[in-house]
A protein has these predicted regions:
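Substrate-binding pocket helix/loop in short-chain dehydrogenase/reductase
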Residues: 97-98, 102-110
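SDR active-site lid
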Residues: 173-248
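Conserved glycine-rich Rossmann-like NAD(P)H-binding loop of the short-chain dehydrogenase/reductase
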Residues: 28-44
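Active-site helix of classical SDR
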Residues: 121, 157
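The beta1-alpha1 cofactor-binding region of Rossmann-like NAD(H)/NADP(H)-dependent oxidoreductases
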Residues: 39, 60-71, 103
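Residue(s) in the substrate-gating loop at a strand-loop-helix junction
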Residues: 141
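Conserved glycine-rich cofactor-binding loop
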Residues: 12-16
Length: 248
């Protein structure tokens, strides 16, 4: 994909991997639409892109709200006339044993982490299919293959996103579409996601093993847009978890 006057939408762009991905595309001269719930974090991400000479549009958006997602998409279309890449990265998580989880908390994780990807993908397809081009990138996790204790809601969502993405890819292939769909299976990331998580324990929940810088996700997303792989397994710990699950 050529990088001339391109537009990317990044959800979950206020912090962590989403912000790193947005900054990566901004440094390359892309127009970047930033979607997240927190206006202050969005403003900081926008300023970071503009400081490197990039162009950014900050749109406070709850990805669990389909009307808000479509409204954000429409604002991008009005501002820039098209969307070349849509990166789904927004997430919520819940830490605790299954028997203690409240249905409303579990539902919120599903609405943001799964349905947010569904709504984002649909919003992107509505503008990409008429022009028969574009790329959708789903930020996944090794937990899309290997579920772990105490994060049942998040793991269920990542498994579901993988199934949803595979179905979408098959539909586009059947159409002969030029739209690519890639899923990046990430390792544990050094982000503030567990500071945001609803945690039923008194102590902080932290990934075991190596934690990767969010810039690793940014480079993987950049590669996915230009190479259109079905999946990328990113980082040794993610590869070991996925392959180990397949073998044992």
């Amino acid at each position: 994909m050529s990088d001339t006057a391109k537009t990317v939408v990044v959800t979950g762009a206020g912090a962590g991997a989403g912000r790193a991905i947005a900054a990566r595309f901004g440094r390359e001269g892309w127009r970047v639409a930033l979607l997240s719930r927190d206006p202050d974090r969005l403003a900081a991400a926008k300023a970071e892109i503009e400081a490197t000479g990039g162009e950014a549009l900050a749109i406070p958006t709850d990805m669990a709200d389909v009307a808000a997602v479509k409204s954000a998409r429409d604002q991008v279309m009005q501002a820039w006339g098209g969307i070349d890449v849509w990166v789904n990265c927004a997430m919520a998580t819940l830490v605790g044993p299954i028997h203690e989880l409240k249905p409303k908390d579990f539902r919120r994780v599903v609405e943001v982490t799964l349905m947010g990807y569904v709504y984002g993908s649909q919003a992107a397809l509505e503008v990409m299919r008429p022009v028969n081009r574009g790329a959708i990138v789903q930020i996944g996790s090794a937990l899309a293959y290997r579920a772990i204790p105490l994060q049942s809601a998040y793991c269920a969502c990542k498994f579901a996103i993988r199934g949803f993405t595979d179905s979408l890819r098959c539909e586009l292939l059947h159409e002969g579409s030029n739209i690519s769909v890639s899923m990046l299976q990430m390792p544990g990331m050094n982000t503030i996601q567990f500071d945001w998580a609803k945690n039923l324990f008194d102590h902080k929940y932290q990934p075991v093993g190596d934690e990767f810088d969010p810039d690793v996700a940014a480079e993987a997303a950049w590669r996915a847009v230009h190479e259109a792989p079905r999946e990328l397994w990113v980082g040794g710990s993610a590869i070991k978890a996925i392959v180990g699950q397949m073998v044992y």
